[in-house]
Regions:
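Catalytic cores of RNA-modifying enzymes
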Residues: 1-176
Length: 176
């Protein structure tokens, strides 16, 4: 199996219903190339690798998780970038979609990184700490509307999709 690393902000999604909701949102639009950020134990990955006709890559910093994923899902051989999302260049030529249960401790940094890739990122579906998601999706004039709201909303259409209970994660995060 694998161990969870608090230093990497690891809280793995374990609720299959939430996984299916995320997959359903992704399936609402055509996807040709897909980057999964922080696949961890593969809760979303197991669904994503079954999609026909997509070019799939994952980026995972934790070597133990990379080894686990490659052993559990042999089709991932050569499809996992073993680095931090914050340190890589766009992994595809052309446009792509991003999905992930983003580590809460670097989720704002990930959003700024995706802004750098804005000409290529068609869509991003991510799990964020509730406070971050509310700030990103806040309308002008809202008390939490700020720099991140302005920047992301300038280049992307933002939609707050649904809340996820902390018990849907292992271990449950201390924040929503």
């Amino acid at each position: 199996m694998y161990t969870l690393k608090k230093s990497l902000g690891q809280h793995f999604l374990k609720d299959e219903g939430v996984c299916r909701q995320i997959i359903s949102v992704l399936q609402e639009r055509p996807v040709e190339r897909l980057l999964e950020v922080g696949p961890g134990g593969g809760a979303l990955t197991k669904y994503l690798i079954e999609w026909p006709s997509i070019e799939f890559l994952a980026v995972e910093l934790d070597e133990e998780k990379v080894e686990y994923l490659q052993k559990t899902y042999p089709s991932l051989q050569g499809k996992i970038i073993h680095q931090s999302i914050l340190e890589i260049e766009p992994p595809f030529v052309g446009s792509f979609t991003v999905v992930g249960n983003f580590p809460y401790n670097i989720s704002t940094q990930i959003l700024f990184h995706l802004l750098e890739w804005r000409s290529q990122v068609e869509c991003a579906v991510g799990m964020f700490q509730k406070e971050v998601a509310e700030r990103v999706a806040a309308p002008s004039g809202n008390k939490v509307y700020g720099v991140i709201s302005v920047l992301i909303q300038t280049f992307f259409t933002v939609e707050y999709l649904f809340d996820v209970h902390e018990q849907s994660f292992n271990p449950p995060p201390k924040v929503k």
